[in-house]
UniProtKB/Swiss-Prot annotation:
A GO term for molecular function: ubiquitin-like protein transferase activity
Entry keyword Electron transport: no
SMART domains recorded: UBQ
Gene that produces this protein: UBL4A
Entry-linked PROSITE patterns: UBIQUITIN_1 (PS00299), UBIQUITIN_2 (PS50053)
Name under which the protein is recorded: Ubiquitin-like protein 4A
Organism: Homo sapiens (Human)
Effect recorded for residue 105 to E: No effect on interaction with BAG6
Amino acid sequence: MQLTVKALQGRECSLQVPEDELVSTLKQLVSEKLNVPVRQQRLLFKGKALADGKRLSDYSIGPNSKLNLVVKPLEKVLLEEGEAQRLADSPPPQVWQLISKVLARHFSAADASRVLEQLQRDYERSLSRLTLDDIERLASRFLHPEVTETMEKGFSK
């Protein structure tokens, strides 16, 4: 049967699956199509969260049904899983906590949370897109700051 999975951010995909497919298998397919890690997915049908161990037929999900995908923030997933260590390429939790405090002063709790989540996604995306040239440029600036200063002075004249 054909299903449509729509993320809250607007992305969506169509999938062909058997009616008795496991929710966990569907999440794997969604992961491949929308590039959202399985552990960050929460699938909803008519407002009800789907459990990984159940089958689509257990929820009376039929052909041409539309499922909603909620992408859980990575930090929430890590807390739920009880993981103490953060990902190696993420800034220390203190940085996110500090940013969260600053955002809380300027936004409502819900808006601050959404802004922080988007900032974290943008940060991860930026890191994943760094090229070797970008890394070499950054390293040169850190290792030879005097060269960078000289270049900046030359441009400001």
